[in-house]
Amino acid sequence: MKVFLSVLILIFTIQSWTKADDISDFEIEEMSVGESLLNYMDENSIIEKINSKSANYYPNNSFVVFSYKSEKFKIYDDLGIVINPNDKSYIIHSIEGTLYMNDCRDKQLEVVNELKVFFDRKTYEFLSSPNLNYIDDKTGESKVHYEDFYFKDNSAVRVICWSLSKKFLDDGYKNSLAVAANSKYFMNWIKENM
């Protein structure tokens, strides 16, 4: 049985869960890595998404990422979903929930602390990379904070906080908090190809 987890609810309430051994028990807006996207969207909608101008393809069309928004979402403003466009089962290899908010660092640390309780400590390595320069901002004024859970099976969960400069905000970008779950297959592909 899947353990239900909408990560940012953790910010507002305290709940207890069974310790999860891997990311298959981890859900973002009730979706999990390894599930078929067909459980949430019909095939025509998926095809429309992967053929849209806003979809981004990885090298050799191995994967495609697209934004998915739904009024049914309880926590996130939108999701980024990664699938293999040639897989007619449309298995989710990565899912990222994004919440647009200012001053996300404290909330990020709250989420990380709850995830440390949720996941079995023996199954992951934790790496914190706070206050890095955001690669797209050559001035160094925008910062990004990564908090990573690397699992023994090579899957990963990352909690990200973007604190953007005034110029980026004026250009229409938004500060945000994101939680991403990546399958071991996707993580292995990234290591080999990126």
Identify the residue ranges that each predicted region occupies:
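Sec-dependent N-terminal signal peptides
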Residues: F4-W17
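Compositionally biased P/S/T/G-rich terminal and signal peptide-adjacent segments
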Residues: V65-I91
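Non-cytosolic coordination micro-motifs
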Residues: A20-F63, S89-M194
